[in-house]
Amino acid sequence: TTDINTDIKNQVYFNITNKCPCRCTFLIRNTEDAIGEASNLWFEHEPALEEIYKAIDEFDFSDCNEVVFCGYGEPTMALENLIAVSKYIRERYPFRIRLNTNGLSDLIHKSSTAEEICQAVDSISISLNMPDAASYNEVVRPAYGEKSF
């Protein structure tokens, strides 16, 4: 079984995809199948929206104050699901919604995605892993090369 949601310190993390346009050298996904209480964060297949809804409906959110889109893939690779799941959560719970991202959504989708992302989440954490393009490319290894920085 693969964990779609994992509870860590009053935050529920939603792992909605394993796809990512980067091959970061430092990520735990390179050495571990899971973190925290999760048993496995690698999907046998990318979860359908109905599977994510089912995981939400079956999860105990009683200690939660924030949900975070973050996992073993870049959440914006599954942008349609991210937006739909955010709406689904907002209709049911009063939680803040945060996106942890590599910031490459516009490159991934070949268009501006900021407006729809900002309507779906309350806050965004962008990984700025290195101070310059050369070291960023060496460590993050993005599919889009230097324009990723």
Stretches found by the model and what they are:
Residues 4-48:
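Canonical Radical SAM [4Fe-4S] cluster-binding loop centered on the CxxxCxxC motif
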Residues 47-72:
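Short Fe-S-cluster ligation motifs
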